[in-house]
Amino acid sequence: MPLHRYPVHLWQKLRLRQGICARLPAHFLRSLEEERTPTPVHYKPHGTKFKINPKNGQRERVEDVPIPVHYPPESQQGLWGGEGLILGYRYANNDKLSKRVKKVWKPQLFTRELYSEILDKKFTVTVTMRTLDLIDEAYGFDFYILKTPKEDLGSKFGMDLKRGMLLRLARQDPHLHPENPERRAAIYDKYRSFVIPEAEAEWVGLTLEEALEKQRLLEEKDPVPLFKVYVEELVQRLQEQVLSRPAVVQKRAGDHA
């Protein structure tokens, strides 16, 4: 007899179908249920299931085994480009006959000032060389944030930036360069392919806890009393009836002469 009624790996999905979780927006639930594999950073995948052994010419099965990577809380406040801490062992004194000791491989971090066109603001961010290379490949900081999916960004700070950018694009905020409308229009036109509805942009990058709190606050708003709703409907019906009736014109006695 199994220990649990449902397998452990299904608990998270079952939780999303019950209670307040089930009332979250459908697009946000889809983003939680999508399990995408992040782009390999610390190893090179084979890209195939079989390879030819150069020694004997036989076809052998190969398997991609990802290296376990630890992402500390500091990585959520910067843009590490998918890099993290790798825990492992090394030989003492580089001698294979000596005992193994623990070792932590850390990414090389830099502090850089990055400018966002959409937000018109500079951010002092902790980055890696890979992040700077990815920004160059994307042709700009804003393009890097908007194009990179959540699993590759791997940063709460990055997802918060993406939500802010998407909201400004969706609202066509006039506070961006108010003294230069032409520049503002050029920026919005440059990133028009990333525009999504504002109702969806508000939920981008939220954690499940933040989304539940947002949903709870939306549901706690004072509802409109039913009697007010019925009174408005009654008034509207009476107005429609009055407008639909034909106008009756009474003739005066002097009009017959």
UniProtKB/Swiss-Prot annotation:
Transit peptide: 1-55
The gene coding this protein: Mrpl28
Source species: Mus musculus
Subcellular location as annotated: Mitochondrion
GO-annotated molecular function: structural constituent of ribosome
GO cellular component, one term: mitochondrion
Membership in a protein family: Belongs to the bacterial ribosomal protein bL28 family.
Keyword Transit peptide: yes
Protein keywords: Mitochondrion, Ribonucleoprotein, Ribosomal protein, Transit peptide
Subunit structure: Component of the mitochondrial ribosome large subunit (39S) which comprises a 16S rRNA and about 50 distinct proteins. Interacts with OXA1L.
InterPro entries linked to this entry: Ribosomal_bL28, Ribosomal_bL28/bL31-like_sf, Ribosomal_bL28_sf
GO biological process terms on file: mitochondrial translation
Record's keyword annotation contains Transit peptide: yes
Pfam annotation, one family: Ribosomal_L28
Annotated protein name in UniProt: Large ribosomal subunit protein bL28m
